[in-house]
């Protein structure tokens, strides 16, 4: 019988704290943090290559217009300007694309070009590009490029996008519909007819975007002698970009190298294909020299993908025992003029349909999603894709139903949540669920919050004229996606990840992983897993990420998959390497491999006899192989890959609560406390998990209370700067209390699920419900996010 690595007795139970070099489950400081805090990071903009030129884009000042002419003659005469390109030049070397996925039904997305062709369809769309000695010269020359436009009425309102007389953005499509989908499970009409109580609401979610510390940036360097393209890019998925650049610039994929340097945040913003970045690569190929483009902050607001932008109607029916018997939603979303490539702009709506009511037992479920085009910045996936909308509509209706039935909202949820012993099961929409713990999480949340005390606090505050409210919400979170998410639809997006691990001649360990790092601590958890499974000190483990020439093929970092998929690949490769080490050591030490183990960088005998260091073993293999018996396998490097099979995602679940104070005179909202109980399976580094949840909550606060991309009636983005686009800062951060339930994923040895998006997905619902709880005594509610002071005062009838 073939020996399986997972069966070897030297593989310890994960998180064995009584064992030397046990790192899984420990809050180990991340090594990379020291480098970044000392200002020694290496970001795209830090790189300067010989002969490098700089780009500045001339962008459309209009939301919708026809391009009549482009005159570049004056700008080309500026000293230091090398070239000025329009789509006529760029399309010769870079083909256009369509943002569609084959498995989600008909998507009607027009072809998108790297630069605008004939028409501009959002304010900020790139029309031409100036190539100059430096960015300042390029910007000055851009002022001299003369573009004549014929302005066209902009279609901005998603609610009128399909009206009979509306402006059609792409005439060839006949209307402004991109995609629609309907889910229909059970008999929704009969269920509502027979319902004891029916509640309904409509919620609005404003557009907002991810404001990363580092803006998007790219350096492309075409080497014509080797026909090789090297790209320095601050993205999340190097192998995806390698495939796409190779395809659209007609380069052999193996001759495209993507290097992701240090990346200053992403949140999903940097996992998409942007026209300006493809132009940079095309210009490098045309000019045969390095090209740099760094988006400035004004460009970021008008060109980085936006998100949310939903209006959703929901209806919930219960029987006379307070059991949910019917749930229906109708979601409308506007995505800008194009579906973003290659992930498409349908996924957020698709996740709303999949995830609404996903925590609850719902026998009859109907959901419709409609996605339309607008003359605004393109919209696509951003942290917690679809979750804030799905969770908010679900939990708003659950609160309403509990109130209508005169049942405590905690008890109402307990009576309707999927039981913890019911798995495997499915969401109301039919998506498989495994290994969740809604009841355990909500019970722990109740104890953390001390709900009885909160009720007393509310009443006492009201006597003093202060309006307090609190909430309880439940959610599921999509993590660890499989090929059934994107690959099945034909997108060049890998769902598997790989890891290579090598024992160096010094006895140190080198890990190479296809996962990438944008600040979440990926490098640290890879070190921990490798050190734990090999039995070495973590200081001896070095990690390489983000280079398609030196790392195994894989998907990179998105959808909370780094630990669950990339970490599993490292674990498997570590166990294989350890197995090889012990086999070689057994030959050298003339014993059985099962009598040996690796601890503290040494191969040790379990009976306490003399062992040998990993350095000694490595140098014997690498330098003195003649000392090994013939036939000994000297392999001290192993590679392993991992992917989820059979289901589209591995889900996690959370329960959250929020306490707010609403000032009814000013409309100001203060979050006094926030609680989150998360079940993400095995926690490799609890401190990093806590940081992810807290950071996610703060981004959720941004969407709930502050962040909105505001457009005027002509399609001009009026708050595209850091002064006018509000984000939560240190003062707005409440006390966030995090706790956990641990239900390991049965899909892997490591048992890890994702934790990066729960806070962002759940916080908006928790905040909205808490605000409405505070306003309940006034018999008013708010149904639009962000919940600004103005909206509070309007609801109260004060303005």
Predicted regions and their residues:
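Thiamine diphosphate
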Residues: 266-288, 292-294, 522-529
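Helix-loop-helix junctions that connect adjacent transmembrane helices in secondary transporters/permeases
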Residues: 100, 163-249, 419-508, 642, ...
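Flexible, low-hydrophobicity surface segments
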Residues: 1-175, 198-201, 482, 777
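Short acidic, glycine/serine/threonine-rich loops at helix termini
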Residues: 94-99, 141-144, 233, 242-244, ...
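C-terminal catalytic domains of large/alpha subunits in multi-subunit enzymes
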Residues: 2, 87-88, 250-255, 285-293, ...
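Short beta-strand elements
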Residues: 41, 217-222, 311-320, 326-331, ...
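Glycine-rich loop/linker segments at domain edges
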Residues: 26, 32-38, 104-110, 175-218, ...
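Extended active-site and interfacial segments that coordinate phosphate-rich ligands
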Residues: 34-35, 143-150, 156, 236-238, ...
């Amino acid at each position: 019988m073939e020996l399986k690595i997972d069966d070897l007795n030297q593989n310890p139970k994960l998180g064995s704290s009584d064992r030397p070099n046990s790192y899984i489950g420990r809050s180990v400081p991340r090594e990379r943090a020291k480098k970044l805090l000392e200002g020694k990071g290496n970001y795209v903009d830090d790189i300067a290559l010989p002969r490098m030129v700089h780009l500045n884009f001339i962008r459309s000042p209009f939301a919708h217009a026809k391009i009549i002419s482009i005159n570049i003659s004056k700008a080309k005469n500026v000293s230091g300007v090398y070239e000025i390109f329009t789509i006529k030049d760029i399309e010769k070397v870079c083909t256009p694309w369509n943002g569609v996925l084959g498995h989600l039904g008909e998507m009607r997305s027009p072809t998108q070009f790297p630069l605008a062709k004939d028409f501009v369809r959002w304010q900020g769309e790139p029309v031409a590009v100036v190539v100059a000695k430096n960015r300042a010269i390029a910007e000055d020359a851009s002022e001299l490029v003369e573009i004549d436009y014929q302005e066209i009425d902009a279609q901005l309102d998603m609610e009128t996008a399909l009206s009979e007389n509306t402006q059609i953005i792409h005439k060839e499509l006949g209307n402004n519909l991109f995609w629609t989908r309907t889910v229909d499970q059970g008999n929704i009409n009969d269920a509502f007819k027979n319902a004891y109580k029916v509640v309904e609401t409509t919620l609005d979610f404003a557009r907002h975007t991810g404001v990363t510390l580092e803006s998007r940036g790219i350096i492309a360097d075409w080497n014509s002698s080797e026909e090789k393209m090297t790209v320095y890019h601050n993205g999340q998925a190097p192998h995806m970009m390698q495939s796409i650049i190779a395809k659209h610039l007609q380069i052999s994929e193996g001759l495209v190298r993507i290097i992701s340097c240090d990346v200053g945040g992403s949140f999903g913003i940097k996992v998409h294909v942007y026209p300006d970045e493809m132009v940079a690569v095309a210009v490098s190929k045309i000019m045969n020299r390095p090209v740099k483009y760094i988006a400035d902050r004004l460009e970021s607001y008008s060109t980085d993908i936006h998100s949310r932008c939903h209006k959703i109607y929901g209806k919930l029916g219960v029987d006379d025992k307070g059991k949910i018997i019917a749930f229906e939603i109708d979601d409308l979303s506007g995505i800008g003029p194009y579906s973003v490539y290659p992930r498409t702009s349908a996924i957020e709506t698709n996740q709303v349909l999949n995830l609404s009511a996903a925590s609850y037992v719902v026998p009859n479920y109907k959901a419709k999603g409609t996605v339309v085009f607008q003359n605004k910045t393109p919209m696509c996936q951003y942290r917690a894709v679809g979750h804030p909308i799905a969770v908010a509509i679900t939990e708003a209706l659950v609160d309403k139903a509990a109130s209508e039935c005169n049942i405590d909202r905690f008890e109402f949820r307990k009576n309707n949540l999927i039981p913890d012993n019911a798995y495997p099961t499915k969401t109301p929409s039919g998506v498989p669920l495994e290994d969740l713990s809604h009841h355990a999480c909500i019970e722990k949340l109740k104890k953390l919050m001390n709900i009885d005390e909160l009720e007393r606090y509310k009443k006492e505050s009201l006597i003093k004229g202060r309006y307090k409210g609190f909430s309880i919400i439940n959610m599921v979170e999509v993590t660890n996606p499989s090929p059934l998410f994107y690959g099945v639809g034909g997108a060049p997006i890998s769902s598997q990840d790989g890891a290579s691990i090598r024992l160096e001649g010094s006895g140190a360990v080198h890990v190479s992983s296809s996962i990438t790092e944008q600040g979440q601590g990926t490098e640290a958890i890879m070190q921990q897993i490798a050190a734990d499974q090999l039995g070495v000190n973590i200081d001896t483990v070095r990690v390489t990420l983000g280079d398609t020439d030196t790392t195994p093929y894989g998907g990179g970092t998105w959808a909370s998959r780094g630990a669950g998929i990339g970490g599993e690949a490292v674990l498997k490769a570590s166990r294989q390497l350890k197995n090889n080490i012990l086999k070689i050591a057994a030959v050298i030490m003339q014993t059985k491999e099962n009598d040996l183990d690796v601890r503290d960088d040494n191969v040790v005998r379990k009976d306490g006899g003399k062992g040998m260091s990993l350095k000694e073993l490595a140098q014997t293999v690498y330098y003195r192989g003649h000392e090994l018996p013939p036939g000994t396998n000297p392999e001290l490097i192993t590679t392993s890959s991992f992917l989820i099979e059979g289901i589209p995602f591995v889900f996690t679940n959370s329960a959250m609560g929020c306490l707010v104070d609403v000032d009814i005179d000013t409309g100001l909202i203060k979050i006094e406390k926030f609680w989150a109980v998360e079940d993400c399976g095995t926690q490799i580094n609890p401190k990093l998990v806590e940081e992810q949840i807290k950071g996610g909550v703060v981004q959720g606060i941004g969407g709930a209370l502050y962040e909105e991309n505001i457009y005027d009636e002509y399609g001009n983005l009026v708050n595209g700067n850091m002064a006018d686009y509000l984000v939560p800062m240190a003062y707005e951060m409440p006390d966030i209390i995090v706790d956990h339930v641990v239900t390991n994923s049965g899909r892997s040895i490591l048992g890890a699920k994702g934790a990066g998006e729960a806070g962002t997905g759940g916080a908006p619902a928790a905040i909205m419900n808490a605000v409405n709880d505070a306003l309940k005594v006034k018999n008013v509610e708010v149904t639009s996010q962000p919940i600004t002071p103005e909206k509070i005062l309007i609801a109260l009838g004060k303005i």
